[in-house]
């Protein structure tokens, strides 16, 4: 059995979106890579905050459940059609940047942040997002398993994958590997 200290406390899901954070009197924009009830992973930060705790607003996409949707309905969808919610809380950077020069900070690509005292509404929004993404990922994996030689099934698979943020042009084995990796990352290290 694996060491419980190495297990994640929360499920996490990819979130390719944006976040705004405040440092002093300035607002900065960053990319979000993944999200869990415990925190999120940011990239493309134009500025490493001077303080450890900062207010943040996250653009959270509201995916529908794709299972049971007809191919024509899925093909009509675009991520622009999905509702979005702006959720706000405070985060603490998990990694310390003390004793690093400003030049060293320029080369930092990712920053993990944990949520600091999120309110129940925020927690519910994150939980719902992660749970729904997980269900859609399981559905997408089931499409791989039942693929066979049916053209409609491949179209449905590629359409759902695209809506979840994957490149629909990838070769099927590579696409499956990426989806499987994200599925495995949902709950374990």
Report residues per predicted region.
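Structured alpha-helical
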Residues: 1-189
């Amino acid at each position: 059995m694996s060491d419980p200290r190495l297990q994640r406390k929360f499920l996490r899901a990819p979130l390719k979106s944006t976040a705004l954070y405040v440092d002093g009197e300035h607002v900065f924009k960053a990319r979000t890579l993944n999200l869990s009830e415990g925190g999120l992973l940011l990239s493309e930060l134009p500025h490493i905050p001077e303080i450890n705790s900062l207010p943040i607003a996250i653009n959270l996409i509201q995916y529908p459940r794709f299972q049971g949707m007809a191919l024509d309905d899925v093909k009509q969808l675009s991520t622009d059609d999905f509702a979005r919610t702006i959720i706000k809380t405070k985060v603490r950077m998990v990694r310390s940047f003390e004793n690093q020069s400003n030049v060293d900070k320029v080369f930092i690509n990712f920053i993990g942040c944990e949520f600091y005292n999120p309110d129940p509404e925020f927690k519910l929004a994150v939980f719902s997002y992660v749970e729904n993404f997980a269900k859609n990922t399981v559905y997408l994996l089931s499409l791989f398993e039942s693929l066979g030689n049916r053209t409609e099934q491949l179209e449905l698979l590629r359409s759902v994958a695209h809506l979840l943020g994957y490149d629909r042009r990838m070769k099927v084995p590579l696409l499956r590997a990426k989806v499987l990796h994200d599925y495995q990352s949902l709950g374990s290290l």
